[in-house]
């Protein structure tokens, strides 16, 4: 149900027009001739055409398969994506637990040389998680039964999670660096080059901004999975779970002057539902039995085993595919957005549109090419 239906005229449809052929060819040949005389121009052309890999900082409340885990797998399997590192945050799972899951996926998917760091175990506001269940109970959303880490005993040791879960010793040693400092250091050492994929609560990014506010302008792009802009939330009627876990962090991030921000919100996530046939196509595209085991342990596998007619949203996976190929976006709206970060507010954690010029213009995808989306997912997974 949409709280504020998006007017059709505000949806920007991406399409290719038809232009006269000979002027384009003439100009193209002329440009190629000129650029061949100047090596610097050739390098610029290579960079603009994607000749260089896109560098990505992957920040996530990682789970083993759907949805963060599969997002990590397909990013690792994309030749023109270079993941600099994985930082974890509490959301779906505790940050230490997420680190164990991420390390195992990295071992199985060619990510042994990445940096792995357990990030923020708790949200920015002290005691925020203490009241989480009470808030949701008082104002439950459609998916209020799922509450992530707060539903489980807190995990504080990634190694014990790993060995208990996988009955083996890890091959990857994580870094002890503070996640927020790592994020800031990476951005400052490669200004204008890094894309942040933030598919969990925004705590690590917000902490990096608090200590190094200059990183916003030096980041190439940030892509979030979070929020519900013009539609209902899932955990409460107003808020989506990632942003509700740490509303203060979400607000700090989307208010920051990043050159380009994209929020993959429930507005588009709710349009992509995976049925059993599609899930089996994804599962069967994987060849590695060890990786398939992670899928079998996942809730999605069990869901379709118990109810073949069920469907499931894939949230974070959409953000990852957009990072790989933003051309899957077929409709979007650009708007100035903010987050309600007032703890006593009845709409705490809600993303909303504002006309305030002090807020950033953010792209909100509304439609994607679903055939292309699933083709990208299965083609990447088929490498394993």
Region roles according to the model:
Residues 27-36:
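Bacterial N-terminal signal peptides
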Residues 9-27:
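Bacterial N-terminal signal peptides that target proteins for export
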Residues 50-113, 157-271, 276:
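Active-site histidine-anchored catalytic micro-motif
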Residues 39-40:
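C-terminal motif of bacterial Sec signal peptides marking the signal peptidase cleavage site
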